[in-house]
Amino acid sequence: MAVRRALIVLAHAERTSFNYAMKEAAVEALKKKGWEVVESDLYAMNFNPLISRNDITGEPKDSENFQYPVESSLAYKEGRLSPDIVAEQKKLEAADLVIFQFPLYWFGVPAILKGWFERVLVAGFAYTYATMYDKGPFQNKKTLLSITTGGSGSMYSLQGVHGDMNVILWPIQSGILRFCGFQVLEPQLVYSIGHTPPDARVQVLEGWKKRLETVWEESPLYFAPSSLFDLNFQAGFLLKKEVQEEQKKNKFGLSVGHHLGKSIPADNQIKARK
C-alpha cells in the first residue's frame, strides 16, 4: 500500500504555545501510523504573507495595469512564480492530507496564514471556474482545521455572544478549502485553551493523537454538490430551478451558506453527516 503523505501548516509564532504542542502531537501520531509528514511552520520560515509583483519573475503581461490574479495564474502556467510559492505548492501537491493548525484571530485565520492562502492557491493551480468545489484540483485530498480559541465553547454556540461557530467556519472551510476541491473533515476545536488546566491539556493532546490514528477513514463535511447548480455565466451559477422547487419541501437549507432563507442544518460545518 502506498505511503500516505501529510502536510501540516502551522500559524503560530511561539514554540511554547499549545498550537505548537498540537502540531507536535499530530506529527507524532501520524508518523506512528506510517505517514510521511512535511511541515510548513510559517513563522519559523518567515513566510511572506504579502501578495506583490515580486511573486512573479520576468515581465508581467500588463505592467501598467497589473492584476495579481491574472498575472499569478499566467506565471504559474509559465513557471515564473517565486521560489517560495513554488516550494509550498509542491508540498501541497504531494500531500494526501493537509492540517492547518492555528489560533482563531478576529473570527478568522492569522494574517500569515491568510497570506499563505492568497499566494499559494493561485488560479490554474488551485482552481478555475471550470474546476472548483467538488470538481476542484484537490478533490482527492482531505483537509481539516485544528483551531484554538480564547473564548469558551458556549460563547460560540447558537445562544453565545460570539455567535454560531458554524457560521464563522464557513468562509474558510467552504470559501477556501472546498472551493479548491478539498474533502473537508470535521474541525478539531479546542476552546478556551488559556483557561484550560495542564491535566486537561494533556487529555486534549491525547484525544487529538487518537483521532489522527484513523483520520483517513473519516467522512467529510457536507457541502452542496456542484451538480445542483447551473455552472455558467448565462445562468448566473444559480441553483437549478428543479432543485429550488425540490428544496421548498424541506425544513432546513442545504448548508450554512446555502440556507435558502431557512434554518441552517445543525452543526453543518462541525459534524459530518451520519
UniProtKB/Swiss-Prot annotation:
The modification N-acetylalanine is found at A2. InterPro entries: Flavodoxin_fold (IPR003680), Flavoprotein-like_sf (IPR029039), NAD(P)H_dehydrogenase_qn (IPR051545). SUPFAM superfamilies: Flavoproteins. Its cofactor is FAD. It catalyses: a quinone + NADH + H(+) = a quinol + NAD(+); a quinone + NADPH + H(+) = a quinol + NADP(+); ubiquinone-10 + NADH + H(+) = ubiquinol-10 + NAD(+); menadione + NADH + H(+) = menadiol + NAD(+). Keywords: Acetylation, Cytoplasm, FAD, Flavoprotein, Isopeptide bond, NAD, NADP, Oxidoreductase, Phosphoprotein, Ubl conjugation. The gene is Nqo1. This is NAD(P)H dehydrogenase [quinone] 1. The modification Phosphoserine is found at S82. Its EC number is 1.6.5.2. It comes from Rattus norvegicus (Rat). Substrate binds at A126, Y127, T128.
